[in-house]
């Protein structure tokens, strides 16, 4: 399951910054544009069997695809071993795959999409009602302290240096992290 989610994360990582649909067209080779058959779209395994190349044009496929799939699979396995199919598994899995998508998008574009960080913030707050680790008050405090702390740093830097030193995406991301993790201590 985790590797399949990782496969979808690759779609998100590749298409979201380009403002492309996450649903259509179906998976295709980034080089020749040929649609990828379902049997060539099995997470990690297809990459290995095809030796990292497109079946149609033989162009190399980035190793990032199986890396993201494997990372999502390993994270799912680790969380499942800890929580089983309890609500906390799903809460924390959503959190880590959102972080994974954000990390790779940020690596490519130096941008953190609001659609991920803000929806993650809301999901984290709502998930706190089901969480065994924190209450909704902890989650709300995490949002305010996490995002608020970076916001104050950004304002202070801008006041002192008369230029932006921190992007708004970082502030929203820390708010999202605070929503899922609450306030330490």
Residue positions per predicted region:
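Membrane-helix interface segments
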Residues: 38-40, 63, 86-87, 136, ...
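Functional transmembrane core segments of multi-pass inner-membrane proteins
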Residues: 89-185
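Hydrophobic alpha-helical transmembrane segments
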Residues: 1-4, 76, 80-81, 125-132
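Alpha-helical transmembrane segments of multipass membrane proteins
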Residues: 5-10, 72, 76, 127, ...
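Membrane-proximal soluble regions of multi-pass membrane proteins
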Residues: 9-64
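Select subsegments of transmembrane alpha-helices in polytopic membrane proteins
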Residues: 62-68, 114
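Active-site-flanking alpha-helical
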Residues: 13, 79, 177
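Transmembrane helix-loop-helix
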Residues: 81-91
């Amino acid at each position: 399951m985790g590797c399949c989610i990782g496969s979808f994360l690759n779609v998100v990582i590749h298409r979201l910054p380009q403002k492309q649909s996450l649903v259509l067209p179906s998976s295709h080779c980034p080089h020749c544009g040929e649609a990828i058959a379902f049997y060539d779209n099995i997470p990690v395994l297809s990459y290995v069997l095809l030796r990292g190349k497109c079946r149609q044009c033989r162009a190399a496929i980035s190793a990032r695809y199986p890396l993201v799939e494997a990372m999502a699979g390993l994270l799912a396995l680790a969380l499942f071993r800890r929580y089983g199919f309890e609500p906390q598994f799903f809460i924390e899995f959503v959190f880590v795959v959102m972080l994974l998508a954000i990390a790779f998008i940020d690596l490519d574009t130096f941008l953190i999409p609001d659609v991920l960080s803000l929806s993650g913030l809301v999901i984290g707050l709502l998930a706190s009602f089901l969480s065994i680790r924190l209450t909704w008050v902890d989650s709300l405090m995490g949002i305010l302290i996490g995002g608020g702390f970076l916001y104050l740093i950004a304002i202070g830097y801008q006041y002192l240096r008369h230029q932006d030193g921190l992007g708004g995406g970082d502030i929203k991301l820390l708010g999202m992290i605070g929503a899922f993790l609450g306030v330490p201590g």
